[in-house]
């Protein structure tokens, strides 16, 4: 089962692309280290206070993949200075 999690993030404290980069790098690095998934910024690269992330993982069981995506979402939501403005999941 392939799980895709698309996230729309709001970074209200970012006043420049440099301000945006630090928390995003932290999120990308932490998710890659803690979970066996791929993650990338896929939208709003030139917007200071918005980011679109995509997370893709593979597992033999959908329930296990859902659990992993839930953990990732929770970790991102707990990141200081980052607000999750929307999420969408797809199963392939």
Give the positions of each predicted feature.
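Absolute protein N-terminus
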Residues: 1-2, 92
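Active-site-flanking beta-strand signature of metal-NTP-handling nucleotidyl enzymes
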Residues: 2-8, 55
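A structural boundary/capping signal
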Residues: 8-10, 36, 63, 74
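C-terminal binding/interaction regions
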Residues: 20
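Short, charge-patterned binding micro-sites
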Residues: 40-61, 90-92
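C-terminal structural segments of small proteins and small subunits
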Residues: 57-92
């Amino acid at each position: 089962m392939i799980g895709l999690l698309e996230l729309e993030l709001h970074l209200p404290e970012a006043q420049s692309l440099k301000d945006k980069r630090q928390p995003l790098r932290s999120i990308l690095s932490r998710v890659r280290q803690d979970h066996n998934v791929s993650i990338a910024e896929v939208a709003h690269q030139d917007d200071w206070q918005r980011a679109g992330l995509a997370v893709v993982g593979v597992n033999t069981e959908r329930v296990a993949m859902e659990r992993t995506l839930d953990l990732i979402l929770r970790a991102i939501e707990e990141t200081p200075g980052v607000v999750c403005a929307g999420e969408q999941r797809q199963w392939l």
